[in-house]
UniProtKB/Swiss-Prot annotation:
The modification Phosphoserine is found at residues 580, 582, 910-912. This is Glycerophosphocholine phosphodiesterase gde1. Residues 806-1125 form the GP-PDE domain. GO terms for cellular component: cytoplasm; cytosol.
Length: 1135
């Protein structure tokens, strides 16, 4: 993902308008770079008075820098004052506090400390993102405009400002840490005092207050400090004791700060009727009428008590009643304030109403879903003030963020708020309601005038497009029913239906189908978010080249947020960076993908004649990633008890700001994202260990750690078998207490070095082992070009839309067997089927390969063989048993199976095997088994097809003509497939499975063309690492549920294929028939596009795909489809 997109995700709503306009300035740089040299130089020079030209890039940078500095200075002062208030606030009297159950005060203070900690993290995030944005913009100017802004602007100006270093934020954090320690000490003291047995004064005083015996309360007030008097007054308000109130107010006097503090405390502890507060106001008015001659001073006192006096959080009495939802008190207080002569009309959106957390009484009522309290506040507000700019987050947008509060939405709109008002990111309330899956809010907004065609800033998406991209079926139905247009396109030219289909939400296609003819010209890929980052692609290409000399280790991290350091300790272990070689000479930055130590590694590594690498002392085996923890990124873990000091020295780990893994397009509620994938190489995987550290923010202090052996993350079951189930999460232990503080899911894929070189069917292509230096500067372009040219005839579609370049591939040979076919079919995945498909003009034939219990690759589609009369997985049957399940095994195959069986040593003299001549024909049980189980049609079935014996991969390679290419599908179940088909969750070890099949192909394959494919993403990765033949990733494109995110949708499949530089994808044809323009998106990524599925047997569907550029179709009726395409070409030529 690009930095500008990550920055949009990291925006903190409160500060949204104060961020650097990164995208705007970057576009300006591109425009200036396209100008003639004279005009460009003019815009980059200062005027005679020292100012920058109006509208120039430098002027924009200066203005944005000033915005950032102003906000930082304002906020840091506010937060420092907040800390000071909390530290100087007097503690209440212990006994009276206990009498009022004022453990609430301690809890409230603890909440304030947490909120302050959170605000400091937000400010830290704001500073880091803007600093990074300035650095990238300066580097961009230097790159495209030939300036030196990285030095003159960034280093000499930005880096010297307070916001760009951590000193002031650290000072606040250290003060907060000290305050938190004192709070903990006071809590311990309170607990000890609560152990005392007798509190006669407390019990008597409470009884006297409840009975409103003022004389006894007067005695307790003699010589009492203000804090005690405030507590007694608060207790009197709660009890509704008028006489006690008079006496205590007489002692306190008409001091607004004490009276407001007592009233706030009483309101916060109210648990029943609010008559006591009304009695307090009545008593106060009576006293004021005696003390003051006119009503001016009494009104002013009430105004100060209710509105002006604030606590340490900057909240007044009005904030308290709105937060707790006391609607009656809200009405009463608003009535009192409005009745004061010469008072200004109430406007809850004015900055003066904001507390330290930028909350107003209005926003507090919204967050608490207090409809009646909100109604009271809005009734007292001047109707004209609703047009006033409400701040960074409009109330309607805020409502849709915090909950599905349709009644709150109704109150706000009826009070005059604009339903189409936008926030700083140009999102309306309707966009926000869709993003957070608030169907009731969506209904109410549409009912009260929200515009369903409003567009956001980032992608120019309407609410319908956003709902489609997140798969929210209910909201899509609501929007379509309200008249939202399904024909509109976003900034890249894609419709809502295409956004839904590419993300795997095919069930929405019927609701979003457009009747408008869309252009078949290439469109922008931006809003589809299917591109892999260049750094990901580079790191994986380098891993492919290093595979010959080292094992590649892919570590995946999930379910852990914050600043994470992942290290691999082992023999010559190195993190494979995706850093561009062009940056090798440039200065390192805080987000470079490789530190300088990696450069020295490249320089010091030498390549021996056998392709091995000499280890260097500067090798880097760790990487730091910033995993987003909320709507703002890189906030890191700032734990008060583990606060890092500002002068800690950073280590030499590579720092990787992991924008590439963060999904920018909105995720559905409870949706999943791909894990964070890191690539390492090492020589010895058996002795390697993985260390995962949770680091403090802005330092390398370790807050938690987990360590494990690399091999322990592979669920090895012995005998080359492994489990499909994920391992249990690893506990992350605190560095101080050694107690678990979090859990992390870690998954590992290891591509082990094999004795033989990587398999290639092309003699002209060789790949010697490369050093890391060579890998960093030499790409696999030549190798890829050779691969693509080798298969060009099968994967190139002509510009005219003709099908003469479209490969027709026989599905499982001549085609998948169908029960409804009227003509007799050859059995699928049989030798006869493969040979016949070649005779009928198939460019390639597709076959499915699995392995038996005795490790022989065989050709069979289903994971379960039930021709035996029982369900048996292929890997649980020996070759003899597998071939015996065939309806008509050939004599040659019988002999092969017998030879294998006879070579096997019996486990005991009493054991024996069934001779070949008397082996059991399992086919006799098939008919009985079919009656007992649900009707699942099996290919190559007796009575439905020209039944042929099962076959091995070796026989296919020997018998099928060399002129016919083979599309070999490696059948390996994913966990979701195993659960669907009720398989045991075990399978062969990844490496053993792939190596065994590749060795057979290498030994017997000859010089034919090969394409490898698999539905399992990890198998595809190993094929790309272990073989130079083209690899295709098979995806169901959303037509079936898959737990692996990479296999769940067309979008994820395209990103995955791009990352690992596969030849292309083989997609289920349904999504591409629904949205054929997505074929062009696949081609724009440089990937080949193959399709499979029953719908490919319809000629019209195939022609539709051919028109948009599909490279190959896998079909069941090879002859009919080939003839139809030839006729299609002839009709085009005649036209």
């Amino acid at each position: 993902m690009k930095f500008g997109e990550s920055l949009q995700l990291a925006l903190i709503p409160e500060f949204a308008e104060q961020y650097v306009d990164y995208n705007g300035i970057k576009r300006k740089i591109q425009l200036v770079a396209a100008l003639p040299e004279d005009e460009r130089k003019k815009l980059l020079r200062r005027n005679s008075d020292g100012s920058w030209p109006k509208g120039s890039i430098d002027e924009m940078l200066e203005n944005d820098l000033q915005k950032v500095v102003n906000l930082f200075n304002t906020r840091i002062v506010q937060l420092d004052n907040y800390v000071t208030r909390l530290s100087t606030e007097k503690s209440p009297n212990t006994e009276i506090t206990q009498a009022l159950s004022s453990s609430y005060e301690a809890e409230e203070k603890a909440k304030q400390l947490k909120e302050l900690d959170f605000r400091l993290q937000q400010l830290s995030s704001f500073c880091e993102w803007n600093k990074l944005a300035f650095e990238k913009l300066a580097a961009n100017m230097d790159k495209h405009l030939g300036t030196e802004r990285l030095v003159t602007f960034y280093e000499q100006k930005v880096c010297k400002l307070d916001f760009a270093n951590s000193s002031k934020i650290y000072e606040s954090m250290i003060a907060l840490k000290a305050l938190n320690s004192s709070q903990n000490d006071s809590e311990v003291k309170d607990k000890l005092e609560k152990l005392s047995i007798h509190h006669p004064l407390k019990k008597d005083l409470l009884a006297f207050i409840q009975l409103d015996i003022a004389a006894e309360v007067v005695t307790a007030c003699i010589n009492a400090p203000d804090s005690v008097l405030v507590d007694i007054l608060a207790a009197s308000i709660i009890a509704g004791a008028k006489a006690c109130m008079r006496e205590v107010i007489g002692r306190i006097g008409l001091r607004s700060e004490c009276l407001a503090s007592a009233l706030r405390r009483a309101i916060n502890n109210l648990c029943g009727p609010d008559e006591g507060v009304l009695y307090f106001l009545e008593v106060l008015k009576q006293i004021c009428s005696v003390v003051y001659v006119d009503s001016y001073h009494s009104n002013r006192l009430l105004s100060r008590i209710l509105l002006v006096e604030r606590n340490s959080k900057g909240q007044s009495v009005m904030h308290s009643v709105a937060k707790l939802g006391w609607a009656g008190l809200c009405s009463k207080f608003c009535e009192i304030v409005s009745s004061i002569p010469d008072s200004e009309p109430l406007n809850w959106m004015l900055p003066c109403w904001r507390d330290v957390m930028h909350d107003t009484p209005l926003t507090l009522a919204i967050k608490g879903n207090h409809v009646e309290a909100l109604h009271a506040l809005l009734s007292a507000q001047d109707k004209e003030t609703t047009s006033t700019k409400p701040g960074p987050v409009p109330p309607l947008v805020l409502t849709c963020c915090v909950g599905d509060y349709d009644l709150i939405v109704e109150e706000l709109i009826l009070a005059g708020f604009n339903p189409n008002e936008v926030d700083a990111s140009s999102n309306t309330a309707l966009h926000t309601a869709v993003r957070y899956n608030r169907p009731e809010c969506v209904k109410m907004l549409l009912k009260l005038g929200a515009n369903p065609s409003a567009r956001d800033f980032l992608n120019s998406w309407t609410p319908l497009m956003l709902a489609s991209a997140t798969g929210l079926s209910e909201i899509v139905s609501i929007l379509v029913a309200s008249g939202a247009s399904v024909d509109e396109v976003d900034s890249s030219g894609w419709t809502a239906m295409e956004q839904a289909v590419v993300r795997g939400y095919l069930h929405l296609a019927d609701k979003l189908r457009t009747q408008v003819a869309l252009s078949d010209k290439p469109v922008n890929l931006h809003t589809l978010y299917i591109k892999a980052s260049s750094s990901e692609m580079r790191s994986r290409k380098r891993a492919m080249d290093l595979q010959l000399s080292r094992s590649v280790v892919i570590i995946r991290i999930s379910d852990l947020a914050g600043r994470i350091r992942v290290s691999l300790q082992g023999d010559d272990a190195v993190y494979v960076s995706g850093r561009s070689p062009s940056f090798a000479a440039s200065r390192p930055s805080s987000v470079d993908f490789m530190s300088q130590s990696t450069d020295s590694l490249s320089k010091n590594d030498t390549t021996a004649s056998n392709g091995s690498m000499t280890p260097s002392s500067s090798q880097n085996n760790s990487v730091i990633i910033d995993i987003p923890r909320s709507h703002f990124d890189n906030a890191g873990e700032v734990c008060l008890e583990n606060l890092a000091e500002p002068d800690e020295i950073a280590d030499d780990s590579i720092h990787l700001h992991y924008d590439a893994a963060q999904e920018n397009s909105p995720q559905p509620v409870n949706g999943s994202s791909p894990p964070y994938e890191l690539v390492f190489v090492t020589r010895n995987t058996e002795e390697a260990t993985i260390t995962i550290d949770l680091l403090a923010n802005r330092s390398h202090k370790i807050l938690g750690r987990t360590v494990c052996c690399l091999t322990s993350l592979v669920s090895d079951l012995g005998n080359h078998m492994q489990s499909l189930k994920p391992l249990a999460p690893l506990p992350l232990l605190s560095s101080k207490t050694l107690k678990p503080i979090a859990h992390v899911n870690a998954d590992v894929l290891i591509s082990k070095v094999t004795v033989d070189d990587r398999f290639s069917s092309n003699d002209g292509i060789s790949t010697p082992a490369l050093s890391l230096e060579a890998v960093s500067n030499v790409s696999r372009t030549a190798l890829e070009d050779a691969e693509r040219s080798l298969h060009k005839s099968a994967t190139t579609t002509s510009e005219s839309g003709k099908s003469n370049g479209v490969a027709v591939i026989g599905h499982r040979g001549l085609g998948k067997n169908q029960p409804d076919r009227l003509s007799l079919q050859l059995g699928e995945n049989t030798l006869q089927s493969f040979i016949k498909a070649a005779d009928l003009g198939a460019s390639y034939v597709e076959l499915d390969v699995q392995m038996t219990k005795d490790m022989v690759p065989v050709v069979y589609h289903d994971f379960i063989v039930n021709e035996t009369g029982t369900d048996a997985q292929v890997h649980s049957l020996t070759l003899e048993q597998f071939l015996g399940a065939s309806h008509s095994p050939s004599e040659e195959i019988k002999d092969d199976a017998s030879d294998i069986q006879q070579k096997r040593r019996p486990r005991a003299y009493s054991s024996s095997f069934t001779p070949s001549g008397s082996q059991v024909n399992f086919g006799e049980f098939a008919e009985e088994n079919a009656r007992l189980k649900p009707k699942v049609y099996k290919g190559n079935a007796l009575g439905h097809t020209i039944c042929a014996p099962f076959t091995t991969l070796k026989d296919v390679l020997k018998e099928v003509p060399q002129s016919v290419g083979l599309n070999v599908e490696f059948k390996y179940p994913m966990l979701s497939e195993a659960e669907e088909e009720k398989l045991l969750p075990i399978a062969y070890d990844y490496n053993f499975y792939v190596d065994t099949i590749l060795s057979i192909i290498k030994k017997y394959g000859g010089k034919r063309k090969y394409i490898f494919s698999s539905f399992n993403p990890d198998i595809c990765i190993l094929l790309s690492l272990k073989s130079t033949n083209p690899v295709l990733f098979l995806t169901e494109g959303g037509t079936a549920y898959r737990t692996d995110v990479r296999a769940a949708s067309l979008r994820q499949a395209l990103k995955f294929a791009s990352q690992w530089s596969f030849l292309g994808i083989v997609s289920a044809c349904e999504p591409l028939i629904m949205c054929p323009r997505l074929i062009k998106a696949v081609k724009q990524l440089g990937l080949s596009c193959y399709t499979y599925g029953v719908l490919n047997n319809d000629v019209d569907n195939v022609r539709r795909q051919v028109r948009f550029g599909v490279d190959a179709v896998i079909v069941d009726n090879v002859l009919a489809i080939r003839r139809a395409l030839n006729q299609y070409d002839e009709s085009l030529e005649s036209d």
